[in-house]
Structures are given as structure tokens and as C-alpha cells.
């Protein structure tokens, strides 16, 4: 019987069937950070349990760290306590930790792939919803809650109900200056934030095959924003070239043998999906969210929707509420709204390709006076590479702040927060009310779009910048 990629990974990791809908799965990799792990470790200690597979558990500091300093003292008292607890827990239970003194420290979903921890065909979990990022490698990866973090630490297993399968076919290739961020935002705009609920999505087609690994990570990162349990892209030569030589990837003959197995992990011809969606890549333009949900998104040259023209009364009310919070008017273009802050970073867009795209836009230009502009690399390795390539110098010369790695302004859990009423062009993944700070107004965009907003003071069509 023909199988999807999801079917194959699920079957390979099923230890036992709990009932007709639920199986017990083996977990290959467990990623840990300071926010969702303290209670899990405390639970182990209370029950006198050990970590079953510390060699398959990897930790980093990311959510609460200061991006202005590598000192623990730069974090708030609560954040510092969580960071210190992670350090103590990893030492006690024998877990690899990339702390603030390590060049490998970074956002967990940047660190995992660049270390070769993320591999095709594996099951990966983390106490963070954007674990879907790792699906770009053909891995089944998703977020879990703190009680499940404890369970995986103790057993290296997880009970899961198998989801339905969703195929998202991208025909043709994206146009120049249109990125994977624009693609996934367009998909979310089409399906809505509940369109993927109950599904694991597989992205395929020429438009996906043409993407780099970093672009694929951006795409899968926001699978959760359309409600999907996980996002998958079958591995290929681009994947294998990315992984070869990375610290935790197989080496030599073992790598060659792994590739032979990974090449079998593709959806079979004739395999049936529960739902199929198709998009033409060439029809997608640079995207911007205008509201307070990732599905409230428009193309850069489109107008903000009018609630009076929306036949769905619930959607119309949602539009009115979002317009009020965002301080916008229906029928306007977003170029009329001035930007106060620009944030380029997060697990969605803080990799070297993202920084190169932003630097290309800002080189030789200046950030508009009064705009706070932050560049926060996703890891110490990304930071060093950007500095070696001269990108950091370009950003600093333009007036950007060049920060240390961390989750930063993606979420208001550290000192990088958006002020009330301030409008931010952000390369992060969520634009909910208060996500970046109480009263803050978030517009999700690609790195190039964010960079262009910094030097113009408002959103512009970057197709005219290239």
C-alpha cells in the first residue's frame, strides 16, 4: 500500500498501539530550553527518576536571555533563575547544554539543525510550538507541553494520536524578492489559522524543491500558524549537502548509509492525502500582515480589507477589532503607516541567508531617524559568520543595533519589548495582541521587507528595491 512520508515516519517509530487512534511513539531527539523545562526536571527529581537518554537530549538558552550582554546578570531576576535552573538541571542529569558562553548557543530551532541534531526520518519534540521548523529535514517534529517534556525525559516515548494528512502543492517557482516567508504567509492567508488543524502538512512541488534548507525551515516554522500539528518536506540532495560534516550528523560510511535510507523517505506515488491544496508560486507577492492574526495578511500592493464588504459576520467583527487595535483604516495601503521599530530575528528568520537578504537592502543606506532597528542573529555561529562576511558592519553603519543571539523581540519574555502603540516590522511568526509587548502593533514580513521599512520609515514594495 502506498504511503505518505508521514505514514512512513510514524510507522517506523510506533512501539505499541494504545487504541485505534493512539500509538506510543519512540522519540529520537528532545530539545530543551529554560522556559518549559524547570517543572519537568522537578517532576523527575520528585519521583526519583533519571533522564532515560541524555545523549538524545540537547539544551540551549534562548527565550529569556539578554541580547545586549552574555552575562546572566543582564537578565531579569525571573529569567536569571530559569537560566540558572537549566544549567543546574543539565549538569545533574548529564545533558548537553549550550549556555551563554558557548558559540553554539542560540535559538533552539536554529541550533538544532546547524549542529546536525536534526536529521531526516527522526521524531523530534521540544516544549515550544515552533518545533515544526525541523520538519524541513523530513523529520516529524512538533511542540509538546511541560508534562510531556517530563514524560519524554523519563521514557524517550510519547503517546500520540495520528493526525490526518494535508498536501500543500506549490507549482512553479517564486519570483525574485519573494521568499519562503511570503510563501507561508500566503498559504496561511488562504487556509486561515485553523485550516491545518488536525493535520500534518507535507509541502511539495517545484516551488518547494527550489528552496534552500534555510528557506524550508522558515516555511515549516510557521506550519503551526495555520493550525497544523507539523510541517514536512521530503529530504533531498539539498538536505544532505547541508547536513554533511555537521557535529552530530553521521560521518563517512555511516553518512552514506544514512543517505541511502533517507532517500526512501518520500511519499509514494499514488499515496492518498486527506486534503490537498495547490498554489501557484508565481502569483505570490511580498506579504505583510495588517491585523492581529497571521491569517490577516495582504500583498504589499493590496489594500487593507473593509469589514463592511465581508459577508461573514464573525470575520467582519474580527476585522473591525484588528483595525482598532492596529490603528489602521480599511481601504488604505500599509505604506501609509509609519514604522517605529524594526526587528530582524526569531526562529523564523535569523539565519545567515536572512541576514544577507537584509544587508543587501540596507547597504550604503541609513535607518530613518527615530526608528529602533534590531538585528538579532539566531545563534553564536550565525553571528560569527555574519561578522566574518562583513554583514554586521553593514548593519551597524546603517544604524541597526547588532545584538547577541536569542529569541529577543519575538515575544515579550525578555527585555526586548515593543512599547504600547508602537508599530513594528517584524520577521517573527506571530502578530497577536501584545505578543511583542503590551499594546504593541506587529506586522509580520520577510527580512528584506523589514530592512526596507527601516530605511524608508514605512513599508515599501521591495520589488522596486532590487
From Swiss-Prot:
This protein's record includes keyword Iron: yes
InterPro entries in the cross-refs: 3-IsopropMal_deHydase_lsu, Acnase/IPM_dHydase_lsu_aba_1/3, Acoase/IPM_deHydtase_lsu_aba, Aconitase_4Fe-4S_BS, Aconitase_4Fe-4S_dom, IPM_dehydratase_rel_enz, IPMI_cat
Catalytic reaction(s) noted: (2R,3S)-3-isopropylmalate = (2S)-2-isopropylmalate
Gene field: leuC
Enzyme class: lyase
MF-aspect GO terms: 3-isopropylmalate dehydratase activity; 4 iron, 4 sulfur cluster binding; metal ion binding
Function according to Swiss-Prot or TrEMBL: Catalyzes the isomerization between 2-isopropylmalate and 3-isopropylmalate, via the formation of 2-isopropylmaleate.
Residues that, per the record, bind [4Fe-4S] cluster: 347, 407, 410
Domain of life: Bacteria
Pathway: Amino-acid biosynthesis; L-leucine biosynthesis; L-leucine from 3-methyl-2-oxobutanoate: step 2/4
Family: Belongs to the aconitase/IPM isomerase family. LeuC type 1 subfamily.
Regions that span the bilayer: none
Protein's UniProt name: 3-isopropylmalate dehydratase large subunit
Organism, as annotated: Pseudoalteromonas translucida (strain TAC 125)
Origin organism lineage: Bacteria, Pseudomonadati, Pseudomonadota, Gammaproteobacteria, Alteromonadales
Amino acid at each position: 500500500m502506498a504511503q505518505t512520508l508521514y505514514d512512513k515516519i510514524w510507522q517506523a517509530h510506533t512501539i505499541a498501539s494504545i487504541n485505534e487512534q493512539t500509538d506510543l511513539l519512540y522519540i529520537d531527539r528532545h530539545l530543551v530550553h529554560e522556559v518549559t523545562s524547570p517543572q519537568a526536571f522537578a517532576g523527575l527529581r520528585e519521583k526519583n527518576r533519571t533522564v532515560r537518554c541524555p545523549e538524545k537530549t540537547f539544551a540551549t538558552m534562548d527565550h529569556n536571555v539578554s541580547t545586549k550582554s552574555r552575562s546572566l546578570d543582564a537578565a531579569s531576576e525571573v529569567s536569571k533563575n530559569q537560566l540558572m535552573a537549566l544549567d543546574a538541571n543539565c549538569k545533574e542529569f548529564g545533558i548537553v547544554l549550550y549556555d551563554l558562553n558557548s558559540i553554539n548557543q542560540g535559538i533552539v530551532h536554529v541550533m538544532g539543525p546547524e549542529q546536525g541534531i536534526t536529521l531526516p526520518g527522526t521524531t523530534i519534540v521540544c516544549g515550544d510550538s515552533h518545533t515544526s521548523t525541523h520538519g524541513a529535514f523530513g523529520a516529524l517534529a512538533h511542540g509538546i507541553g511541560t508534562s510531556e517534556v517530563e514524560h519524554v525525559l523519563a521514557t524517550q516515548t510519547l503517546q500520540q494520536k495520528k493526525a490526518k494528512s494535508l498536501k500543500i502543492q506549490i507549482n512553479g517557482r517564486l519570483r525574485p524578492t519573494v521568499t519562503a516567508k511570503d510563501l507561508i504567509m500566503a498559504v496561511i492567508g488562504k487556509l486561515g489559522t485553523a485550516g491545518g488543524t488536525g493535520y500534518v502538512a507535507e509541502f511539495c512541488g517545484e516551488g518547494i524543491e527550489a528552496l534552500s534548507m534555510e528557506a524550508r525551515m522558515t516555511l515549516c516554522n510557521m506550519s503551526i500558524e495555520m493550525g497544523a500539528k507539523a510541517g514536512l518536506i521530503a529530504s533531498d540532495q539539498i538536505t544532505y549537502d547541508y547536513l554533511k560534516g555537521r557535529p552530530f550528523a553521521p560521518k563517512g560510511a555511516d553518512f552514506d548509509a544514512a543517505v541511502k535510507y533517507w532517500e526512501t523517505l518520500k511519499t509514494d506515488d499514488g499515496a492518498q492525502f486527506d486534503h490537498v491544496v495547490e498554489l501557484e508560486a508565481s502569483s505570490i507577492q511580498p506579504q505583510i500582515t495588517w491585523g492581529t492574526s497571521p491569517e490577516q495578511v495582504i500583498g504589499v500592493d493590496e489594500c487593507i480589507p473593509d469589514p463592511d464588504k465581508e459577508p461573514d459576520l464573525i470575520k467582519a467583527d474580527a476585522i473591525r477589532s484588528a483595525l482598532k487595535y492596529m490603528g489602521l483604516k480599511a481601504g488604505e495601503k500599509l505604506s501609509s503607516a509609519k514604522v517605529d521599530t524594526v526587528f530582524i530575528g526569531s526562529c523564523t528568520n535569523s539565519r545567515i541567508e536572512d541576514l544577507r537578504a537584509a544587508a543587501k537592502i540596507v547597504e550604503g543606506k541609513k535607518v530613518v531617524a527615530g526608528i529602533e532597528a534590531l538585528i538579532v542573529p539566531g545563534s553564536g555561529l550565525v553571528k560569527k559568520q555574519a561578522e566574518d562576511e562583513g554583514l554586521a558592519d553593514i548593519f551597524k553603519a546603517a544604524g541597526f543595533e547588532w545584538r547577541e543571539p536569542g529569541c529577543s523581540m519575538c515575544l515579550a519574555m525578555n527585555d526586548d519589548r515593543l512599547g504600547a502603540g508602537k508599530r513594528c516590522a517584524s520577521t517573527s511568526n506571530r502578530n497577536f495582541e501584545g505578543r511583542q509587548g503590551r499594546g504593541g502593533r506587529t506586522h509580520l514580513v520577510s527580512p528584506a521587507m523589514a530592512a526596507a521599512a527601516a530605511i524608508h520609515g514605512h513599508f515599501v514594495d521591495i520589488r522596486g528595491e532590487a
